[in-house]
Amino acid sequence: MDLHNIREDYSKRELSEADCADNPIEQFERWLDEAVRAEVNEPTAVNVAAVDGRGRPNSRMVLLKEVNSEGFVFFTNYHSRKGRSLELNPFAAMTFFWPELERQVRVEGRVGRLAEKLSDEYFESRPYQSRLGAWASAQSEVIPNKAVLVAKAAAVGLKHPLHVPRPPHWGGYIVIPDLIEFWQGRPSRLHDRIQYRLLDGGWIRERLSP
């Protein structure tokens, strides 16, 4: 399949240092708010990349559930491939892509588990069927067919018809950033790239060549 001619010239916006907040979390919140207001498809979807014990990278899309002064929060099964990778090598890279705005954001940092209380609170906010699924799915494990999964979810529902507690193998992670890069597409591939690096407890802002 020849894909050489699939290209687009970016021209919607530009990103100057004067446009950027001093703190990258504040800058991210600005861009995320603009993505939401622009009705970008799945604005909180983010690719999370991790590296397992053999040095093999793996990545997938998850949904960002919170951003705060500490970092970026998502939830998952701790026994999944990403969960096992993050336990062995507690660093991750995240990429947000908002093509409607010709923007992407890269985040790198150390990963830690959220406090159980916070995971409990979020789990309680999930729809009932989603809570059943968290118990039924041995995420990333091979299963013989979908019927097995459906039957397990039904069994959990019979056991917990009203209240589904959080499984001990399910909860939140926070990516505590030490690098955040903002990318804005520009004409002639002369894209704007503004990077923030954490150095001695403070953020350094610098422009990168595209």
UniProtKB/Swiss-Prot annotation:
Binds 1 FMN per subunit. Keywords: Flavoprotein, FMN, Oxidoreductase, Pyridoxine biosynthesis. Pfam families: PNP_phzG_C (PF10590), PNPOx_N (PF01243). FMN binds at residues 60-65, 75-76, 81-82, 104, 139-140, 183, 193. GO terms for biological process: pyridoxine biosynthetic process. Gene3D superfamilies: Electron Transport, Fmn-binding Protein, Chain A. Signal peptide: none annotated. Catalyzes the oxidation of either pyridoxine 5'-phosphate (PNP) or pyridoxamine 5'-phosphate (PMP) into pyridoxal 5'-phosphate (PLP). Belongs to the pyridoxamine 5'-phosphate oxidase family. PANTHER family: PYRIDOXINE-5'-PHOSPHATE OXIDASE, PYRIDOXINE-5-PHOSPHATE OXIDASE. This is Pyridoxine/pyridoxamine 5'-phosphate oxidase. It comes from Neisseria gonorrhoeae (strain ATCC 700825 / FA 1090).
